[in-house]
């Protein structure tokens, strides 16, 4: 593969030029997209069957499906968010609005019947929140923009910990990872210079031997 070619070339004292047009015999151009000069992040689904392309500065995500026959990703198409239309709106597909969507992660949803169904969570940097996208393209706000705390000072941003939607607030969040073993999100709060956590814990009601609803809240982490 290309990885082996790269290693051999560097090991033998050579250089490596990653520009496709300069190396037509090494790289294969799969497709071009409308925003080559903007910031991109690519998130490949755990099954490898599709990927999301996040266009940070133009406020939307594209989706590229994997062609099993050709063994390559096809030209991506607009999936959620409006091309060059920043804003804040929970909605479906291209009707949703976001503002500088940054890092995201796929998280398996056990409520879905399919074994390959994952929700996609991402940080919406200039909307100061964590958003969620279902496989069908339904965009919702998962955490941040505290409905109650924002009433006190009129800001959707802040450093409050607590209930995900009523209390918790973030400021310019740019990073997000998920620990499957701990069932915990780690959120990079850029302006606050902190790593915040969101836990999804399900406590057991010993008396009734039943599960009570999930306790989801944010806390500051020193990890």
Residue ranges of each PLM-predicted region?
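Short loop/turn segments immediately following the C-termini of beta-strands
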Residues: 56-57, 66, 125-126, 190
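Conserved beta-propeller blade signature
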Residues: 50-53, 119-122, 184-187
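Gly/Pro-rich loop segments of beta-rich domains
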Residues: 11-38, 72-102, 138-174
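Blade-level signature of beta-propeller repeat domains, shared across WD40, Kelch, NHL, RCC1
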Residues: 172-208
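Short loop/turn segments immediately following beta-strands, especially the blade-tip
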Residues: 10-17, 64-71, 199-204
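Structural WD40 beta-propeller signal
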Residues: 45-47, 107, 179
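Short, small-residue-biased leader/transition segments that mark boundaries at the very start
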Residues: 1-6
């Amino acid at each position: 593969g290309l990885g082996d070619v790269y290693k051999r070339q560097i090991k033998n004292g050579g250089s490596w030029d990653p520009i496709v047009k300069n190396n037509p015999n090494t790289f294969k151009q799969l497709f071009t997209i409308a925003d080559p000069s903007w910031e991109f992040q690519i998130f490949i689904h755990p099954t490898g069957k599709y990927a999301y392309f996040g266009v940070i500065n133009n406020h939307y995500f594209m989706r590229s499906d994997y062609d099993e026959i050709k063994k390559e990703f096809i030209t991506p198409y607009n999936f959620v968010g409006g091309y060059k239309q920043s804003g804040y709106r929970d909605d479906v597909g291209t009707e949703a609005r976001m503002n500088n969507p940054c890092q995201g992660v796929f998280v398996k949803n056990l409520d879905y019947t399919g074994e390959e169904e994952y929700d996609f969570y991402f940080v919406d940097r200039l909307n100061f929140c964590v958003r969620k996208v279902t496989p069908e393209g339904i965009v919702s706000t998962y955490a941040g923009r505290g409905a109650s705390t924002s009433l006190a000072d009129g800001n959707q941003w802040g450093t409050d910990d607590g209930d995900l939607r009523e209390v918790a607030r973030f400021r310019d969040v740019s990073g997000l990872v998920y620990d499957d073993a701990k069932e915990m999100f780690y959120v990079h709060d850029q302006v606050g210079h902190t790593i915040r956590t969101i836990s999804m814990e399900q406590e057991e009601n010993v008396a009734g031997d039943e599960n009570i609803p999930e306790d989801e809240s944010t806390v500051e982490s020193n990890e």
